[in-house]
Amino acid sequence: MSSHVPSFLRGTPDMTAHGGDGKSRNVAGLMLAAIGVVFGDIGTSPLYAMKETFSGPHAVAMDKGNILGVLSLVFWAITIIVSFKYVIIIMRADNRGEGGSLALLALVSHAAESNRRLSLMVSALGIFAAALFYGDSIITPAISVLSAVEGLQVAAPHLEQWVVPLTIVILFVLFAIQSHGTDLVGKMFGPVMLVWFLTLAILGIRNLSHAPSVLAALSPHYAISFLFREGWHAFLALGSVVLAVTGAEALYTDMGHFGRLPIRLAWYLLVLPALILNYFGQGALLIYNPEAIANPFFNLAPASLALPLVILATLATVIASQAVISGAFSVTRQAIQLGFLPRMEIIHTSEEEMGQIYLPFVNWLLMCMVMVLVVGFKTSSNLAAAYGVAVTGTMVIDALLVGTVMLLIWKWNPRKVKWLIGGFLVVDLAFFLANSIKIPDGGWFPLVVGGLLFTILTTWKDGRKRLLARLKADALPVEDFLASLSDRVPRVPGTAVFLTGTSEGVPIALLHNMKHNKIVHERVVLLTVIVEEVPFVPEERRLENRLLAPNFHRVFLRYGFMESPNIPKALAHARTDQLGFFYEPMSVSYFVSRETLLPTEKPGLRGLRDTLFATLARMATSAMDFFHLPSNRVVELGSQIEI
């Protein structure tokens, strides 16, 4: 890392970007890649942010004073929330290079485990932030693509009635190609978004020349005077101003893919200047041409370039949507690995990049929800009301979680933390409260989605915890099992691997195999997969073998929450001295237990949660598919458990 880079941009020395081959790539290449993935959401906000402030349901009067006031609010919101809070502060709180709500939750939970009350509060906040992310993942593709296609109203007014149908077609194609991966088209994301941000800057500069006086709005004086002068109307305007910072959390979430330094450099050198120039260009346009408020972004360009701009904007919003969809896949895998969701089918779409995954269930569910939003809300203006609630809610939670990191992990001075986080919360809560006014107009949607997913995430986590405790309590101790083994029990050649979720006792599948088949394999392995609260586990720590008796092993396979467990691959890669025996794939049989959960009648909420847990368990992907076990070597034994 070059010595001329300012220290506040560098991050900690251990911060590296990791791809599928685990090798760091050059900073310039990572910057270009980050421009194509990380900044899609915030980079397409100019399509609708200014328009909503002056023409939305809570619009403010459009005079020069108010335009300067709104521009000042936009500039300082981006400066405080994105440039300072996320880029400088929150991006320092990585979990071994990974960012995002669940990675931050895993980091903080470990530090707070000695304080039960704090641990529960932190867990609830982190889980709700992850739940809100899914609401954002549904809204972003809908509002982004819709706002781009709405440019046809300027470029080709006679096609206005085709805005919604075209949006649906574009989104359907986007979701349909997910199963094929984005390896090929993904290489175009960076160059396309580079052209997009340069276009934003050029359009802004072109219009600034007509009213350069708008640059005075860089002074916070205009933001403060606007708030005091307009009062309630200015407060409501915050609900639209916050649209300029939607996507800020992506800088933190995608940190593991590109590294801290490339994201920071891309932000300060390209994305931030382009956004500010474009917003101020829109402000200048509205001063000298108030009629442009119908769609200020597309009116920045000459009429002859309106259609090419619509095409470029559509490409940019598709890329932004792709980044959000890929993020939903990644967060879902994290949630599964950390025990917040049942197993789902995870398909790797690239042999080189292990981060490129496809989850069919998540993909088609997202598509259906996005289509419902487009058809139901019809315009980006209507969707804007739903957008801000999820974003501002996540911003508040991120501030609280990073404050916990400052106190428990970084050991910062409590007074310093109080003032810093307090300042962030004043800004975040102001935006959140302004957006809460929009709840009846569509803001209810991300809250409903977040509430449903919070219930699912917590129900599964709590249910698995209680189920494993029950299995552990009922399990026969290994010592008793070994002592009860008679020499008369036939031993058959080969190795039997019994998967078990607990690290103690004998798996139910082993007892059932003994009961029904009356045999024991010459070598028995009790295998438990453990997911640690880190993104990746080094290969040298992957496998741990404990010899419980001659030819009777307990094996632990450790993975991080960003990895997909592959049991046969892990066993094949293990050394013979590490594993304790020679691994021969064709001599191994895998035994898995499939529990059928039977909820008992319980009054109130507990009964409903038990029923939900049992339903989720039935929907879970089989252990055979999830752990990549060869189907012709698997024996599945069922059991019924009352909960």
From Swiss-Prot:
Annotated region described as Disordered, given as residue ranges: 1-20
Subcellular location: Cell inner membrane
Keyword Membrane: yes
Keywords linked to the UniProt accession: Cell inner membrane, Cell membrane, Ion transport, Membrane, Potassium, Potassium transport, Symport, Transmembrane, Transmembrane helix, Transport
Keyword Cytoplasm: no
Catalytic activity: K(+)(in) + H(+)(in) = K(+)(out) + H(+)(out)
MF terms in GO: potassium ion transmembrane transporter activity; symporter activity
UniProt topology in membrane: Multi-pass membrane protein
Transmembrane segments annotated in the record for this chain: 27-47, 70-90, 120-140, 157-177, 185-205, 231-251, 267-287, 300-320, 357-377, 389-409, 419-439, 440-460
GO CC field: plasma membrane
Main function: Transport of potassium into the cell. Likely operates as a K(+):H(+) symporter.
Family: Belongs to the HAK/KUP transporter (TC 2.A.72) family.
Protein name: Probable potassium transport system protein Kup 2
Top-level taxonomy: Bacteria, Pseudomonadati, Pseudomonadota, Alphaproteobacteria, Rhodospirillales
